[in-house]
């Protein structure tokens, strides 16, 4: 038993030593250790078997994964394609929705435009209908008036009443009445540039802020529409995600689903972040623009604030300086009095100088008044001459009318003589000797009529001679002028001379108006100088009164002697104050010197302005001399015209002597007739030239001629009436020639009138130039007046400031006197100074009395000048009214300036609010920039992680290869070990120790292998996850690129569509413009056709009227007419035949 126990103990001890258990082993715990050791061996064997089964299961699972892998790939490809197709469908839907919206907006615009065009078309059609109705009514009215004005009844010398047609009375107006040359003078308006600039700045700022508000509102509307679109897109995407999640839930592993959900969430986050990045970039751009604008406004505001602060500092400095000046003026009143006396002396000198200038101006005014009187006398003389000339013109026109009527009568007489001779010969041929005793009676009546008319014209000529002789007795000048006018052979000379005289008259009137304006300007200047003189006199009196009051106050400031004993202790303090006062006195002297320099500078400026006014006066005098020279030239021209009139009067006397004989009259009329025939030939030549201009109206004339031809064809069916119409047509041709002559005369008259118009237009242009020069001079004078007013206002302000300073000086003086009562030594010195001041006051009183005497003399002179200027105050009252109006306007402008200041304060408050908003926006921008920077950093971190993971993947793949190689080697070793174990089972007892050690080593290696396998599994999982993430990232990149590409394509397509729409708009606008142009062209054509139609109607009516008049004149003169021809052809019905 002991040997068996010992053997067991030795075996167990060895095994424990082999396994590394070195602890002590007692005999009592030997059975327990045996059991534990047997259990350990059992567990190791079971572990070995489980590992083998696990290896087999892994091999089977690897085979299963290899079989399922192509199905997984195919399923993933199909799902990806499905997702891409669905994304494209969504994009197409969005694009179609946007396109539909744009088409709807364009359709609405087109509908509005079509509605507007329809409305305009209806309006134009309605207007055309109204115009057509009005034209029809007017045409009917014209026809009615023409029918009313066609016929009239005239009693012929034979006692019969015949109806003749009168020409329609016409009134040809070449041009409207010329406008009045003298327009209302522009009222000068004072312009304050500071107020205008502030108002303009405020208005501009308000407009800019309103524009910014509108732009922000538009951007907000755009952003809201974009948010709506994006919300719709997000809803569609979420629906798609839900659909895909439902589709992919069945038969998928939870890991894959979780990974896909993570990828989807990551994609959503990335898309959302991209959208936020884009939105934030756009917001950054807008905010940068806004910040720039606000910075600019801030700079402007800061500049304004700096300017205002500088102004405030300057004002503070000026206030301190004014305080110092007040103190110095208080302590040094004597020097102030001396400077005031000096200024008064200078003011006296200026008053004397201005009085001398006023005297010079009055002398010039007197000279100009004399010249005005002379010019008015010349004007009256010229007006009388113009009246005489107008009478002569009327006489000349009457003579020309009589001459034309006589020429017409002579032509009608010649025609009637020819017709009578023809009738006599025809009567002789038809009726023989029986008709002889009838024709002489007609000739006798005709000759008697001619003699009566001759006697009538003789009487008219004698009456005209009697009128001319009577007017020649009244004034020799008018008689000469009349005779010269009667002797002028042509009307063109009369018109040219009359137009020259009228032109000269107009020029003289303009010269007089200029002189009157110049006199008014001089009077206004004199009035201004008198006003300034009165103001200076008032200021001088006020200054003297203030000086006397100051001196009285200085005499009354003697302190009582009782206070002297109480003030001895304060002597030292008073001495220190005196020293300080002396220092301030020196500073005050320097200030006074500076003020005197400023006053001298202002005086020099005033002297410069006076020199400028003297230069203006010299220029006006030079203009006056030029006008005098022009008047002399006009007189010379008038004398030359009088000589011409004398020569023409002599010629007219010769003509009047020759006109007593009737034969000479007939010869002269024949010569005139020949001249008229020559002029008719010339006018026919001119008409042939002008017929080229009437080609546009020939189409309608041809239509009328065709109608006339048709009527002629109808008339040819009647042979008897055809011969009569031929004769009448010959007569009408003759009258047509006569009318052509009259037309040519009218064209000559029109040419003369056009020349006169051109001359008048030239004269009007010269007058306009002169008026513009006068207006410029008036504006300059107004500017000088405004400058003077500003200078007067500045002087008033300075006087107010001086009064305020004097008041402050008085107050500070009272305080100083109270302090001086406490002083003792100063009282003695002040007593001495008071004595000296009393002496100076006596001298000042004497000077005041002298000044009073001078003032009385000055008042007498002023009263004399006021008596002289009393007559001119009525003329200057209008200028005072204008000045009051200007003053009221200035007050209104001041009120507006205050309003503008209030508005500027409100604008400043708005700017402050805008600054606060800008600060908030800046803070927000900074926060957004920080978020963007964080996103960018995260993006970089993701990229760095991806790169590190790729490197780790490559490293792990290499390690896996090494481990697989090691695994293969280990498996080979295991197989060799198994073979050795099988071989060594027989020698189990011998190799137990070796087997135990090897088993332990094997177990250790197995543990390490399991660890390696678990690590490899984990690495595989990590690799698969990383590959999946890489694929997801690549798909995200691809989708982002596709999105960008599609967005680029959509933007390009939108741009092309916008360009197409713009081209369509331009085409529609061009069509509208072309249609409007065509409408205007058609209207112009309609107007031209209407005018042509009216002209042709007038021509037809005149031709009808002339034909009827010719027929009636032929009937009146007894020519062969259609009814006469019928009487001649049928002698049995005539009364003469009955007598036979």
UniProtKB/Swiss-Prot annotation:
The keyword Hydrolase does not apply. Residues 1121-1133 have a biased composition (Low complexity). Residues 75-151, 199-416, 447-644, 668-1036, 1079-1113 form a coiled coil. One of its GO terms (biological process) is positive regulation of establishment of protein localization. The modification Phosphoserine is found at residues 383, 439, 688, 1130. Keywords: Coiled coil, Cytoplasm, Cytoskeleton, Disease variant, Disulfide bond, Intellectual disability, Phosphoprotein, Primary microcephaly. The modification Phosphothreonine is found at residue 1121. GO terms for molecular function: identical protein binding; microtubule binding; protein homodimerization activity; tubulin binding. InterPro entries: Centriole_BasalBody_StrucProt (IPR051877). Gene3D superfamilies: 1.10.287.1490. Belongs to the CEP135/TSGA10 family. Coiled-coil domains are critical for microtubule binding via the formation of a two-stranded coiled-coil structure in homodimers. Homodimer. Interacts with DCTN2. Interacts with CEP250. This is Centrosomal protein of 135 kDa. It comes from Homo sapiens (Human). The lineage of its organism: Eukaryota, Metazoa, Chordata, Craniata, Vertebrata. The gene is CEP135.
């Amino acid at each position: 038993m002991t040997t068996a126990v010992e053997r067991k103990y030795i075996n167990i001890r060895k095994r424990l030593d082999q396994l590394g258990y070195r602890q002590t082993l007692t005999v009592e715990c030997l059975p327990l250790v045996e059991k534990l050791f047997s259990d350990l061996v059992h567990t190791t064997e079971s572990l070995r078997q489980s590992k083998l089964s696990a290896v087999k299961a892994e091999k089977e699972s690897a085979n299963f994964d290899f079989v399922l892998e192509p199905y997984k790939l195919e399923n993933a490809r199909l799902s990806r394609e499905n997702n891409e197709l669905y994304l494209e469908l969504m994009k197409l839907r969005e694009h179609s929705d946007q396109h539909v919206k744009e088409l709807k907006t364009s359709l609405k615009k087109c509908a509005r435009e079509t509605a507007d065009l329809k409305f305009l078309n209806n309006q134009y059609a309605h207007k055309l209908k109204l115009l057509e109705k009005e034209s029809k009514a007017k045409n009917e009215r014209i026809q009615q008036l023409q029918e009313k004005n066609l016929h009239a009844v005239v009693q012929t010398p034979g006692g019969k009443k015949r109806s003749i047609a009168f020409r329609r009375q016409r009134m040809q107006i070449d041009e409207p009445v010329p406008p009045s040359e003298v327009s209302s003078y522009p009222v000068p308006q004072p312009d304050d540039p500071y107020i205008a600039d502030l108002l303009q700045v405020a208005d501009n700022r308000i407009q800019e802020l309103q524009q910014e508000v509108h732009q922000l509102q538009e951007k907000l509307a755009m952003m809201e529409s974009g948010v709506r679109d994006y919300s719709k897109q997000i809803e569609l995407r979420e629906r798609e995600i839900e659909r895909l999640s439902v589709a992919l839930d069945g038969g998928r592993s939870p890991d894959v689903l979780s990974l896909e959900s993570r990828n989807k969430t990551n994609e959503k986050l990335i898309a959302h972040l991209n959208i936020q990045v884009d939105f934030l970039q756009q917001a950054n751009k807008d905010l940068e623009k806004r910040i720039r604008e606000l910075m600019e406004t801030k700079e402007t505001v800061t500049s304004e604030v700096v300017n205002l602060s500088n102004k405030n500092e300057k004002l503070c400095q000026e206030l301190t300086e004014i305080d110092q000046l007040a103190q110095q003026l208080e302590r040094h009143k004597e020097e102030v009095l001396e400077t005031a006396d000096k200024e008064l002396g200078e003011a006296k000198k200026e008053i004397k100088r201005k009085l001398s200038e006023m005297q010079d101006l009055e002398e010039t005014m007197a000279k100009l008044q004399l010249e005005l009187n002379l010019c008015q006398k010349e004007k009256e003389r010229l007006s009388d001459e113009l009246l005489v000339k107008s009478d002569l013109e009327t006489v000349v026109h009457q003579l020309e009318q009589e001459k034309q009527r006589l020429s017409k009568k002579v032509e009608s007489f010649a025609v009637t003589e020819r017709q009578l001779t023809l009738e006599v010969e025809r009567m002789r041929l038809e009726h023989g000797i029986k008709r002889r005793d009838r024709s002489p009676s007609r000739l006798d009546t005709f000759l008697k009529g001619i003699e009566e008319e001759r006697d009538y014209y003789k009487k008219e000529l004698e009456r005209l001679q009697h009128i001319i002789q009577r007017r020649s007795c009244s004034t020799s000048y008018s008689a000469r002028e009349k005779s010269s006018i009667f002797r002028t052979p042509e009307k063109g000379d009369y018109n040219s001379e009359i137009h020259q005289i009228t032109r000269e008259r107009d020029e003289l009137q303009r010269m007089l108006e200029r002189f009157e304006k110049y006199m008014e300007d001089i009077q206004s200047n004199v009035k201004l100088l008198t006003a300034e003189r009165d103001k200076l006199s008032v200021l001088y009196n006020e200054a003297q009164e203030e000086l006397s009051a100051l001196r009285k106050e200085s005499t009354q400031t003697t302190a009582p002697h009782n206070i002297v004993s109480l003030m001895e202790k304060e002597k030292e303090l008073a001495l220190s104050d005196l020293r300080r006062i002396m220092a301030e006195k020196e500073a005050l002297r320097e200030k006074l010197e500076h003020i005197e320099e400023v006053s001298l500078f202002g005086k020099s400026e005033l002297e410069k302005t006076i020199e400028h006014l003297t230069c203006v006066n010299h220029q006006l005098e030079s203009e006056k001399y030029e006008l005098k020279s022009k008047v002399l030239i006009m007189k010379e021209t008038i004398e030359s015209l009088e000589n011409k009139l004398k020569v023409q009067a002599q010629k007219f006397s010769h003509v009047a002597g020759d006109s007593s004989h009737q034969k000479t009259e007939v010869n002269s009329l024949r010569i005139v007739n020949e001249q008229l025939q020559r002029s008719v030939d010339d006018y026919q030549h001119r008409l042939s030239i002008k017929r080229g201009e009437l080609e546009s109206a020939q189409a309608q004339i041809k239509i009328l001629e065709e109608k006339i031809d048709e009527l002629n064809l109808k008339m040819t069916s009647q042979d008897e009436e055809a011969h009569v119409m031929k004769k009448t047509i010959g007569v009408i041709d003759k009258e047509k020639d006569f009318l052509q002559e009259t037309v040519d005369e009218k064209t000559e008259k029109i040419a003369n009138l056009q020349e006169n118009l051109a001359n008048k237009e030239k004269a009007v242009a010269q007058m306009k130039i002169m008026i513009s020069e006068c207006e410029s001079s008036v504006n300059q004078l107004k500017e000088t007046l405004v400058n003077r007013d500003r200078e007067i206002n500045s002087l008033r302000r300075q006087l107010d400031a001086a009064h305020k300073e004097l008041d402050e000086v008085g107050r500070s003086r009272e305080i100083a006197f109270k302090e001086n009562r406490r002083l003792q030594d100063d009282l003695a010195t002040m007593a001495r100074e008071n004595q000296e001041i009393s002496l100076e006051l006596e001298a000042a009183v004497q000077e005041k009395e002298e000044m009073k005497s001078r003032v009385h003399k000055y008042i007498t002179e002023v009263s004399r000048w006021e008596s002289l200027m009393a007559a001119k105050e009525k003329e200057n009252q209008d200028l005072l009214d204008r000045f009051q109006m200007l003053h009221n306007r200035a007050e209104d402008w001041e009120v507006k300036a205050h309003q503008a200041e209030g508005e500027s304060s409100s604008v400043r408050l708005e700017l402050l609010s805008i600054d606060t908003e800008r600060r908030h926006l800046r803070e927000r921008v900074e926060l957004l920039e920080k978020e963007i920077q964080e996103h960018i950093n995260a993006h970089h971190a993701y990229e760095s992680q991806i790169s590190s993971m790729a490197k780790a993947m490559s490293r792990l793949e290499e390690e896996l290869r090494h481990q697989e190689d090691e695994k293969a080697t280990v498996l080979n070793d295991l197989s060799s070990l198994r073979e050795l174990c099988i071989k060594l089972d027989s020698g189990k007892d011998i190799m137990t120790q070796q087997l135990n050690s090897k088993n332990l080593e094997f177990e250790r290696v197995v543990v390490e292998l399991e660890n390696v396998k678990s690590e490899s599994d984990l690495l595989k999982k990590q690799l698969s996850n990383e590959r999946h993430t890489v694929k997801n990232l690549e798909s995200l990149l691809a989708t982002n690129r596709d999105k960008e590409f599609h967005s680029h394509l959509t933007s390009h397509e939108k741009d092309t569509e916008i360009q197409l729409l713009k081209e369509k708009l331009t085409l529609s606008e061009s069509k509208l413009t072309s249609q409007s142009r065509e409408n205007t062209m058609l209207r112009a054509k309609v107007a031209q056709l209407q005018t042509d139609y009216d002209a042709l109607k007038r021509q037809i009516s005149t031709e009808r009227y002339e034909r009827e008049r010719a027929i009636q004149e032929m009937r009146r003169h007894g020519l062969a007419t259609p009814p006469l021809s019928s009487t001649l052809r049928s002698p049995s019905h005539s009364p003469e035949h009955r007598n036979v």
